[in-house]
């Protein structure tokens, strides 16, 4: 599964938000990738250490459960009362 900046993801806790940053760990002492490389996209099948920030949250790569590649748009004319 490939994740990119701007994708909407859901983690194992059910939190959903837009990916803002992808950090890849380059040492064992930095598993979240805070000091490592920053990327615009990452293939989770590579199994590197690292983490993403999304909305007010962050999670390790192995905690990502789904990636929504399409934006969810709510049209005002579909609401009752408009």
Residue ranges and their predicted role:
Residues 17, 33-36, 50:
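Glycine-centered structural positions embedded in regular secondary structure
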Residues 41-82:
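Intrinsically disordered, low-complexity, charged/polar segments
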Residues 26-38:
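Short, solvent-exposed secondary-structure boundary/capping segments
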């Amino acid at each position: 599964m490939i994740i990119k900046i701007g994708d909407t993801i859901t983690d194992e806790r059910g939190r959903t938000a837009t990916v803002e940053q992808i950090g890849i760990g380059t040492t064992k002492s930095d598993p979240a990738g805070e000091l490592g490389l920053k990327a615009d996209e990452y293939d989770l099948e590579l199994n590197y250490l690292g983490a993403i920030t999304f909305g007010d949250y962050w999670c390790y790569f192995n905690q990502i459960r789904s990636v929504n590649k399409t934006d969810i748009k709510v049209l005002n004319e579909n609401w009752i009362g408009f």
